Design a protein with these regions (language model features):
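Short linear motifs embedded in intrinsically disordered, charge-biased segments
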Residues: 94-189
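Generic recognition of well-structured, leucine-rich alpha-helical segments
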Residues: 35, 53-63, 80, 85, ...
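Short, conserved micro-motifs composed of acidic
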Residues: 1-24
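Structured loops at beta-to-helix junctions and adjacent beta-edge loops in soluble globular domains
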Residues: 2-5, 31-36, 168, 180-182
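Basic, alpha-helical interaction scaffolds
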Residues: 19-87
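Residue-level recognition of alpha-helical structural elements
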Residues: 39, 65-71, 90-97, 116, ...
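Short conserved micro-motifs at the rims of enzyme active sites and ligand-binding pockets
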Residues: 11-13, 40-43, 188-189
């Protein structure tokens, strides 16, 4: 049962069914989601995985892999696992988790694994732009999540987006990819 974390009602879970365990976390398409819609476990899992892969990069560097190839391997085995489904969970990142991921990037940069220093916000912007570029296509599987298009009203002000901005009551919806990106994009234009 997934629920809003700030809900004031106490929800009693149903009695466990025969041979079915009740879990506080679930792994859906490779992303660990808690029952309070928290991604801390997922980020901690990714950081553990990245630490193991940093050791592999260290061994490759000691065996004489040139910096350019080391950079390619770093992109493939560390940056890409952090980018996987990042738009879905990036809005729920807390400051301490963001700082921890940025510390990993700084460590990898200082060890010479990566030539350019990354930040979490750069990765989030890259993945958001890539996804939002493909969402307006009707063939995209998440196209139905977009808000309805704006009606054709004449205005002297040029707008970047032709979508109506959604209203939200709950923080969970506000942190979702589409709502977060639409508001950020409109406020910056």
């Amino acid at each position: 049962v997934f629920r809003r974390p700030n809900i004031r009602l106490s929800i009693s879970l149903p009695e466990p069914l025969f041979n079915i365990d009740q879990l506080s976390e679930a792994r859906l398409l490779g992303i660990i989601i808690s029952d309070k819609f928290n991604f801390t476990s997922h980020v901690n899992y990714l950081l553990t995985l990245c630490a193991q892969r940093c050791y592999l990069l260290k061994v490759l560097r000691q065996q004489g892999l040139p910096p350019r190839e080391l950079n390619t391997v770093y992109n493939a085995i560390i940056v890409n696992i952090l980018k996987y489904a990042l738009p879905a969970w990036a809005g729920f990142l807390k400051a301490d988790l963001t700082n921890t991921i940025n510390a990993l990037f700084r460590k990898c940069h200082s060890m010479g694994f990566y030539l350019k220093l990354n930040t979490v916000s750069e990765l989030i912007d890259q993945t958001n732009k890539k996804l939002f570029k493909s969402l307006p296509k009707s063939e995209h599987c998440a196209h139905y999540l977009l808000p309805p298009p704006k009606s054709a009203i004449r205005s002297r002000r040029s707008t970047v987006l032709n979508y109506t901005l959604p209203t939200f009551k709950h923080k969970l919806y506000k942190n979702s990819f589409i709502c977060r990106y639409l508001y950020r994009h409109c406020l910056n234009s």
